Amino acid sequence: MTEPLRIVFAGTPEFAAEHLKALLDSPHQIVAVYTQPDRPAGRGQKLMPSPVKQLALQHDIPVMQPPTLRAPEAQAELAALKPDLMVVVAYGLILPQVVLDIPRLGCINSHASLLPRWRGAAPIQRAVQAGDAESGVTVMRMEAGLDTGPMLLKAVTPISAQDTGGTLHDRLAELGPPAVLQAIAGLAEGSLVGEAQDDSLANYAHKLNKDEARIDWTRPADELERLVRAFNPWPICHSTLNEEALKVLAADLAEGQGAPGTILSASKDGLIVACGQNALRLTRLQLPGGKPLNFTDLFNSRREKFAIGTVLGQ
């Protein structure tokens, strides 16, 4: 084995924290952690540290939270750490070329897709939404472009018909860390050669927003079924029922035809709603002020709300 490396880690959400855990358990020295500034969160809107910051503080690792890495002071601070390598995972800040050039071995990134497919901010959810057969993690050498660098290695997992954005996220968070450790070993030995991405195969995974999660019942049922899975646990697909908000946490395909959004049937098996093509069976819902419930429980206690012929989304 080569000598342990001086590594700077940059990341923010839980997905990144799983990678940091693996690095902390490795022989390498984590000399500093970069993460996004604390953000307001929760009902009280208190400033909350990122999962990566919380983990770093538990291990007494210096934490840097510059609002940008374009400032000369921030770049000088990074250079003073004399890193051999920078590992970047869902950090959320652009790294200019001057920063990419600071570490002796450069910067690598663990990205939650099989590049060049799904460059960008929401690759996990977009893969589920599109009905992709597989996903994975790509470890790449970073360039100034967005997720465009040479690919060092990939770890692949199939996407099942039951996968949600959440379940795929958790599986990729397990695949990514060992892939990064393998890539670091290869870079340190000089045995790992990057493969250029084919830009003609690239597409962009746009950031999620709540407006996208509003169900358009004129869309085909299979498209909406994938959307429900992709947007769980956030932002959660939603509609309205008698002018009240209705969150849809789980659904599957059903037979049926009718005006889009119309309740075709309601039973303990689910609420069947007509779509632009075919129908969707809603199996887990959340009403205002309530917690998420299987439709069986809602049907037993609130069946009068789900009258046949009622139209959702009006």
UniProtKB/Swiss-Prot annotation:
<dbReference type="InterPro" id="IPR037022">
    <property type="entry name" value="Formyl_trans_C_sf"/>
</dbReference>
<dbReference type="InterPro" id="IPR036477">
    <property type="entry name" value="Formyl_transf_N_sf"/>
</dbReference>
<dbReference type="Pfam" id="PF00551">
    <property type="entry name" value="Formyl_trans_N"/>
</dbReference>
<dbReference type="InterPro" id="IPR001555">
    <property type="entry name" value="GART_AS"/>
</dbReference>
<keyword id="KW-0648">Protein biosynthesis</keyword>
<dbReference type="InterPro" id="IPR041711">
    <property type="entry name" value="Met-tRNA-FMT_N"/>
</dbReference>
<dbReference type="Pfam" id="PF02911">
    <property type="entry name" value="Formyl_trans_C"/>
</dbReference>
<dbReference type="GO" id="GO:0005829">
    <property type="term" value="C:cytosol"/>
</dbReference>
<comment type="function">
    <text>Attaches a formyl group to the free amino group of methionyl-tRNA(fMet). The formyl group appears to play a dual role in the initiator identity of N-formylmethionyl-tRNA by promoting its recognition by IF2 and preventing the misappropriation of this tRNA by the elongation apparatus.</text>
</comment>
<keyword id="KW-0808">Transferase</keyword>
<dbReference type="InterPro" id="IPR002376">
    <property type="entry name" value="Formyl_transf_N"/>
</dbReference>
<dbReference type="GO" id="GO:0004479">
    <property type="term" value="F:methionyl-tRNA formyltransferase activity"/>
</dbReference>
<dbReference type="InterPro" id="IPR005794">
    <property type="entry name" value="Fmt"/>
</dbReference>
<comment type="similarity">
    <text>Belongs to the Fmt family.</text>
</comment>
<protein>
    <recommendedName>
        <fullName>Methionyl-tRNA formyltransferase</fullName>
        <ecNumber>2.1.2.9</ecNumber>
    </recommendedName>
</protein>
<dbReference type="InterPro" id="IPR005793">
    <property type="entry name" value="Formyl_trans_C"/>
</dbReference>
<dbReference type="InterPro" id="IPR011034">
    <property type="entry name" value="Formyl_transferase-like_C_sf"/>
</dbReference>
<dbReference type="InterPro" id="IPR044135">
    <property type="entry name" value="Met-tRNA-FMT_C"/>
</dbReference>
<feature type="binding site">
    <location>
        <begin position="113"/>
        <end position="116"/>
    </location>
    <ligand>
        <name>(6S)-5,6,7,8-tetrahydrofolate</name>
    </ligand>
</feature>
